[in-house]
Amino acid sequence: QGHLYATDVDPIEMEKTRARLASAGFGPELLTIQHRNFADVDQVAPGVLFDFVLADLGVSSMQIDDPARGFTFKQDGPLDLRLDPSSGVTAAERLRQLDQEELENLLAENSDEPYADRIAKAVIQVFRRGGTVDTTRQLYALIEGALSFLPAGERKEAVKKSCQRTFQALRIDVNSEFEVLYAFLEKLPHVLKPGGRAAILTFHSGEDRLVKQAFRQQYREGLYSDIAQEVTRPSPQECRRNPRAHSTKLRWAVRAE
């Protein structure tokens, strides 16, 4: 009989998952859930090599739909964006730490935001006037104002997309998501059994690029015997059932024997 190990950096969602799976019959003899970042995959079960590792890099719908977590600009809430609300600085605090050039670079590098310069300037101007950017709707209003130069017919969609990219960029920074993913990818082949498999679900191009590069490099080094040459995407039917699956990409790798 196998054993399932699961980790979640979010202690709130972790407990919900534990209760949900326990009600489905997954007791402690079958399931171990740890409050742990997957960058520490080598500490999940020291000395154990896994048959299969699945990493889901996305923010959950439960996190997005809770305005108190600050992941959405569609409802007002604190500008938090931390996956683990018990540690680290909030997105609001992070904004106050950055100068205009640093914020512009963050938006450009983490989410390819085309209006990074205008948004960064708008945020810093608020701080210079003694104002605050502490809530999700305050940031939304700033982005809306920064893009007011666009023609009215284009503005609504442009503001929506820039908000999505800006919140993504801040979330990546606040949670050190690229650094965490890099650490996980470096350790991954060393926790798999010979012939063991790994599958990783990504939700934006920056994540997918890191996974693709790591798998290819480790394949060349002989750590993997086979890797996905192309991403697997959700079917149109799945996207209709779950619109948030639309951006999902899956890549896999097989540990060398």
PLM region spans:
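S-adenosyl-L-methionine-dependent methyltransferase catalytic core, i.e., the SAM/SAH-binding region
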Residues: 1-257
